[in-house]
A protein has these predicted regions:
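Membrane-embedded multi-pass helical conduit in multi-pass membrane proteins
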Residues: 232-317
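Catalytic donor-sugar/metal-binding loop of nucleotide-sugar-dependent glycosyltransferases
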Residues: 167-188
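Short loop->beta transition adjacent to catalytic acidic/histidine clusters or analogous donor-positioning motifs
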Residues: 1-7, 26-27, 57
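Active-site-adjacent helix/loop segment of glycosyltransferases
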Residues: 194-242
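Short beta-strand-to-loop acidic/aromatic patch adjacent to the donor-nucleotide binding site
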Residues: 52-67
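Acidic helix N-cap motif at the loop->helix transition within catalytic regions
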Residues: 15-22, 71
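Long helical/loop segments within the catalytic core of UDP-sugar-dependent glycosyltransferases
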Residues: 35-54, 70-162, 204-207, 211, ...
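A conserved acidic beta->alpha catalytic loop
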Residues: 2, 10-18, 33-35
Length: 324
C-alpha cells in the first residue's frame, strides 16, 4: 500500500535532497530557524500538516536512511485501525557493511531485538525513530496533554529537550493510555554506525536519553517496568567484572581453569541461545555468534557506554547530541 502523500522535511539541507524529492512528486517542507534537530524539524512539519488531517488519518514518520518493507504500511495501518494501537513502530534491521566488524555486531544485536519482539507478540516498549505510523487523534492527544500539563514538554508532538525524542514520545503516549506495537512484517533496513567512535556517541545519547526521560516522568505505574529494567541491567553490568575476577582468582590460586559440568552446560546453553536468535541473518550472522568472543567484547563496550551515561546523568552534565 503506497502512502497517500509523501512529505520530505529538509532541515539545513545543502545537497540536492529537495530537488530530488520534488522530482519524484514529494512535497518538500523547509524548516525555519530550527535549533532542536530532528524533534524541532518534525514539530514544524506536523504543525503545518496536522490541521488539514482528520482524526482517522495516520502519519508515517521515518528517517531518511531507512527503507520500508513492502507491506509495512498495509500491516501498520491494519494494526492501528483494528487494535487501537497508539503507534506501530518498525522492527529495524541493520545494513551491515562488514563480516565481523562493528556493523555486523550491530546487525546481530538488531536481529536479537527483532526476535524478542516476535516472542513478546509485537508488544513494543519504544516506538523506533526509524519509522512509525501514528494515528492523528493520538498525536493531537499528545499535544493537548503537554499543553494541559499532564505531560512534560512544550506543547508540541515531540519534546524539544529530549535526547531520544522517540523514547520520550512513547512514554508520553503510554501515560495517556495508548498502546504501542511492532508486529511481524513491519520491518525496515536502516544504516548503522560505521565506527566504534560514532557508535559510542549514538549509544551514549540513547541511554542518556532513556535515563533523562525516566527522571522527567518520575516513578509511575507506566514507568515502573522501565525503572526495573534499568536496575536489573545495571546489576548485570556490575556482576560481570565480579564474575571475571572470581575466575581469574581461581586460575591464579589453582593454576588451572575452574571446571564444572553445570557451568559448562549453562555456558553451552547461552551460546546456543545467542546463535539461535540470529538465525534469520544467514550464515555470516551465525558464524559471528558462534565465535562468541567478538560479541563479548561488544557487550563490554556497551557496558562502558551505559555506565558513562549513568555517570553523566548523576552528575547532571550537559545533554547534547555528539558527532564524531
Amino acid at each position: 500500500r503506497p502512502a497517500d502523500a509523501v512529505i520530505v522535511v529538509c532541515d539545513r539541507c545543502t545537497d540536492g535532497t529537495a530537488e530530488l524529492a520534488e522530482s519524484y512528486g514529494a512535497r518538500v517542507l523547509h524548516t525555519v530557524g530550527n535549533t532542536h534537530r530532528k524533534a524541532g524539524a518534525l514539530n514544524q512539519a506536523l504543525m503545518t500538516v496536522l490541521p488539514s488531517l482528520a482524526d482517522t488519518d495516520s502519519v508515517l514518520m521515518m528517517d531518511a536512511d531507512t527503507a520500508l518493507a513492502q507491506d509495512f504500511l498495509a500491516i501498520a495501518e491494519e494494526r492501528v485501525t483494528t487494535c487501537g494501537a497508539f503507534a506501530v513502530g518498525a522492527i529495524f534491521l541493520a545494513e551491515a557493511t562488514d563480516t565481523f566488524g562493528v556493523t555486523a555486531l550491530q546487525r546481530n544485536e538488531y536481529l536479537r531485538y527483532a526476535h524478542d519482539l516476535h516472542r513478546r507478540h509485537a508488544r513494543a516498549e519504544v516506538i523506533s525513530g526509524t519509522a512509525g505510523l501514528f494515528p492523528v487523534h493520538a498525536l493531537r492527544g499528545i499535544v493537548d496533554g503537554r499543553r494541559g500539563g499532564k505531560l512534560p514538554g512544550e506543547g508540541y508532538v515531540y519534546s524539544l529537550h529530549s535526547l531520544t525524542e522517540d523514547n520520550e514520545l512513547t512514554m508520553a503516549a503510554k501515560h495517556l493510555g495508548y498502546k504501542a506495537a511492532s508486529p511481524d512484517g513491519c520491518t525496515v533496513v536502516t544504516e548503522v554506525m560505521p565506527t566504534l567512535k560514532t557508535l559510542f556517541y549514538q549509544r551514549l545519547r540513547w541511554q542518556r536519553g532513556a535515563l533523562s526521560t525516566l527522571r522527567d516522568y518520575g516513578l509511575t505505574r507506566t514507568t515502573l517496568p522501565y525503572f526495573i529494567r534499568q536496575v536489573l541491567m545495571y546489576l548485570g553490568i556490575m556482576f560481570f567484572p565480579f564474575f571475571v575476577t572470581v575466575i581469574v582468582h581461581a586460575v591464579i590460586e589453582t593454576g588451572r581453569f575452574p571446571w564444572s559440568w553445570p557451568w559448562f552446560f549453562a555456558s553451552l546453553l547461552l551460546i546456543v541461545e545467542r546463535v539461535w536468535t540470529v538465525r534469520a541473518g544467514g550464515l555470516r550472522a551465525l558464524i559471528l555468534a558462534i565465535l562468541v568472543l567478538p560479541e563479548i567484547v561488544y557487550d563490554i563496550f556497551q557496558h562502558y557506554v551505559f555506565l558513562r551515561a549513568a555517570a553523566d546523568e548523576l552528575m547532571r552534565s550537559d545533554e547534547h547530541w555528539d558527532h564524531a
